[in-house]
Amino acid sequence: IQSLGGQLLDKSNAINELDIKVESLTLDVSNLNSQLKSRELAIKDLSTRLGITQSEVEELTPVVKSYFALGVSGNKGIVIPLEVKMSKGTGIVSVNIKNVELKSDAQDSIRIATKVSQDYTGVDLSEKDITVTFVNDNPFIVSLDGPSAGAAITLTIIAGVLDRTPSSAVLITGTIESDGDVGPVGGIEEKASAAASEGAQIFLVPVGQKVNSPGIEVAEVKKIQEVVNLVLK
């Protein structure tokens, strides 16, 4: 009997030890679950912060679009690389030039281009700084009538707002009016020849200024909407 009682006591103690181990394991599992939940919350918080940071980075990163304007040097047309850079700002519009002589009304033309771009896209540009750059890599100065590049500038700003790419196969000359009309300019024949030499397939001109030019199709446009449809990819 004493032996049986001892065995029962040993089994009882073993059961108690198992109960203690089970309670300990249960507590460990509970602590582990708590730690996992805490880490999940930390990961979610970090993801949210990274998302905000990524959004801020995208907002601060300038948008740059490249196209071409056309000028005249003597009796020869010249294709001039044009770049528009847009970044977060306060509505400042500025111009950079290299070996390019701009007429005094160029700044006004760019401001009109900005307004027309805003009207066309429906995007408020008052919190964007816009820099328009003309670079002539030739060793001589090229004269560029500011208004005559208005349509090209407008198109490039619109490309920046819509994040689309202007096609170099279609070039344009023409002023831009506040209502979105493309207005008349000079030097059409010289510019058409330069556009063809640059490899363009189509040269867009204001209504009433179409000319015949070897090696390139010359087409008339009236509104900036037509230009966007033909040039932006």
Label the predicted regions.
Residues Q2-K233:
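Peripheral, non-AAA+ core regions of ATP-driven protein-machinery
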